Amino acid sequence: MLKQEVTSLKNYQIQCPYCGAKAVLRSANKVFGAKTREANRFLYVCSNWPSCDSYVMAHMEDHRPMGTMANGMLRHKRILAHKALQAYRKATHTDKWASYIWLEGKLGLDQQRTHIGMFSDEECDRVIALCRKEIAISKQNRMRGVS
């Protein structure tokens, strides 16, 4: 039944930015193993996987890619950028929506492009640096009693 559901959804044509091979939609179990918390999810995986370790998670409802394909180093950098943005939200008491609007302005990107899953290594570095700077300013303001 699951196979029928997968084939009935739109098929996205994605090419690996690292080796140029076609990406294929696979169960997360095939990449992460059966005991993953992503067990019911799907990924677009480079057809040269595992020698090319590029993949991107797919949305559950329609299997749209959640960003661009990334190798292990870029996926790690995106995780760090997400963590930095979460720390920024916590330090500045900002909700997720407002933090992305802030990020749009800081990066000079539009709403469609302001998703960490679409960011390059350099953009992730900028997010991390911007968040650290704002967290430091917020901390200084709290210490001085400025809100």
Describe each model-derived feature in a short phrase:
Residues 1-61:
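N-terminal cysteine/histidine-rich coordination modules
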Residues 84-85, 91-115:
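Amphipathic protein-protein interaction modules
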Residues 40, 97-101, 125:
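Non-catalytic, well-ordered alpha-helical scaffold segments
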Residues 113-133:
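Chromatin/DNA-recognition segments of nuclear transcriptional regulators
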Residues 61-97:
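Extended interfacial segments that mediate partner engagement and assembly in macromolecular machines
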Residues 132-147:
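Long C-terminal interaction/binding lobes of large macromolecular proteins
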